């Protein structure tokens, strides 16, 4: 049986060092735990973090606490510019995971000879925290993307054109919060280049970038997600490939498909075509009345799509629609920025 530090000749400097790092580790774990609890609502992560804190607490012996001397600590109160660069939850989580990991490593190194039980516990928790940090940051990124999705009322779906990036940038500059890259023509090298350009633009303006159909292309450019049609791969397969932190959308064209989509691991729906559209001439329009039913049924955001223009958008909003996805209304307009502003003004007025 290993003796507790109080039963051995303990160097007070080492005891003080261990006390400080036990505090650091437990505090860092608590910051991460509270985000997992209140920000992510992931009970499994909360349980693991709380268990780690309590295990360290049981090893925080009085002999360590009695060596504490905050008033004479030459490092107390020191600041670093990096501490100010924590403007989002993911940065706070990353910083506190690093803080806890570093403290645990110190406990492991200094505890080997005087407190082997503490050293072993610190090592086990440190390795567990490496994995939990990735899980937590992915979930945090996913939460941020889903919050952006919740706030997005207008999605721009692209169509091939010579001035693609100029039109998309004009729409982003004027407030569009979500872009879906759609390109059925050309080759993969061209698509990759265009998608990379759109990724940079969406990052610049803080907008979401979704890739139509192509999971591989979305992963290649680090897009925020993928939009699937009814004939595309099952959403369960796409979700396994994308992970939980990216968005997944599904096109629907009937109330039955809307019901089915509620059972799929997706984040939003496209519903339509509301009106006749040159993009899908083979599909009969579903009309605004069916959109009202789809919106009432769905537990996820519904983007109306298909032939939507500033002229017919008011009727869509009167029927209960709250979000729209457009192609021609922006991509074929004389002024993409002005067209975006006009559509957003109508959508914003409907939500006031």
Swiss-Prot record:
Pfam families: ThiD2, TMP-TENI. Mg(2+) binds at residues 213, 232. GO terms for cellular component: cytoplasm. Residues 129-352 are annotated as: Thiamine-phosphate synthase. GO terms for biological process: thiamine biosynthetic process; thiamine diphosphate biosynthetic process. GO terms for molecular function: magnesium ion binding; thiamine-phosphate diphosphorylase activity. It comes from the Bacteria. Its EC number is 2.5.1.3. It catalyses: 2-[(2R,5Z)-2-carboxy-4-methylthiazol-5(2H)-ylidene]ethyl phosphate + 4-amino-2-methyl-5-(diphosphooxymethyl)pyrimidine + 2 H(+) = thiamine phosphate + CO2 + diphosphate; 2-(2-carboxy-4-methylthiazol-5-yl)ethyl phosphate + 4-amino-2-methyl-5-(diphosphooxymethyl)pyrimidine + 2 H(+) = thiamine phosphate + CO2 + diphosphate; 4-methyl-5-(2-phosphooxyethyl)-thiazole + 4-amino-2-methyl-5-(diphosphooxymethyl)pyrimidine + H(+) = thiamine phosphate + diphosphate. Its cofactor is Mg(2+). Binds 1 Mg(2+) ion per subunit. 4-amino-2-methyl-5-(diphosphooxymethyl)pyrimidine binds at residues 180-184, 212, 251, 280. Residues 1-128 are annotated as: Unknown. Keywords: Magnesium, Metal-binding, Thiamine biosynthesis, Transferase. Pathway: Cofactor biosynthesis; thiamine diphosphate biosynthesis; thiamine phosphate from 4-amino-2-methyl-5-diphosphomethylpyrimidine and 4-methyl-5-(2-phosphoethyl)-thiazole: step 1/1. 2-[(2R,5Z)-2-carboxy-4-methylthiazol-5(2H)-ylidene]ethyl phosphate binds at residue 307. Condenses 4-methyl-5-(beta-hydroxyethyl)thiazole monophosphate (THZ-P) and 2-methyl-4-amino-5-hydroxymethyl pyrimidine pyrophosphate (HMP-PP) to form thiamine monophosphate (TMP). Belongs to the thiamine-phosphate synthase family. HAMAP family: TMP_synthase (MF_00097), TMP_synthase_cyanobact (MF_01327). This is Thiamine-phosphate synthase. It comes from Synechococcus sp. (strain CC9605). The gene is thiE.
């Amino acid at each position: 049986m290993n003796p507790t530090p109080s039963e051995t000749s303990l160097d007070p400097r080492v005891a003080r060092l261990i006390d400080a790092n036990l505090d650091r580790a437990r505090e860092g774990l608590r910051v991460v735990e509270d985000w997992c609890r209140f920000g992510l609502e992931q009970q499994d992560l909360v349980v693991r973090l709380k268990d780690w804190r309590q295990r360290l607490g049981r090893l925080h012996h009085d002999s360590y606490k009695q060596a504490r001397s905050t008033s004479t600590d030459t490092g107390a109160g020191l600041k670093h510019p990096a501490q100010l660069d924590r403007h989002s939850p993911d940065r706070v989580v990353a910083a506190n995971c690093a803080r806890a990991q570093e403290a645990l490593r110190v406990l492991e190194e200094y505890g080997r000879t005087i407190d082997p039980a503490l050293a072993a516990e610190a090592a086990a928790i440190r390795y567990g925290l490496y994995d939990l940090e990735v899980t937590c940051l992915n979930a945090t990124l996913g939460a941020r993307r889903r919050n952006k999705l919740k706030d997005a009322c207008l999605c721009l779906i692209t169509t091939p054109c010579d001035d693609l990036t100029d039109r998309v940038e004009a729409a982003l500059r004027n407030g569009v919060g979500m872009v879906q890259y759609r390109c059925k023509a050309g080759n993969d090298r061209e698509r990759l280049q265009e998608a990379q350009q759109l990724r940079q633009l969406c990052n610049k303006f803080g907008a979401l970038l979704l890739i139509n159909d192509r999971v591989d292309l979305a992963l290649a450019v680090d897009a925020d997600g993928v939009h699937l049609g009814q004939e595309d791969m099952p959403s369960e397969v796409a979700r396994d490939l994308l992970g939980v932190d990216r968005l997944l959308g599904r096109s629907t064209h009937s109330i039955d498909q809307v019901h089915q989509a509620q059972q799929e691991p997706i984040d939003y729906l496209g519903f339509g075509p509301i009106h006749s559209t040159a993009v899908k001439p083979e599909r009969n329009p579903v009309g605004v009345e069916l959109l009202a039913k789809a919106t009432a049924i769905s537990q996820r955001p519904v983007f109306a799509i298909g032939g939507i223009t500033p002229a017919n958008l008011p009727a869509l909003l009167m029927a209960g629609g709250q979000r729209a996805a457009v192609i021609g209304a922006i991509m074929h307009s004389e002024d993409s920025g002005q067209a975006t502003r006009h559509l957003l003004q109508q959508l914003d007025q409907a939500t006031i």
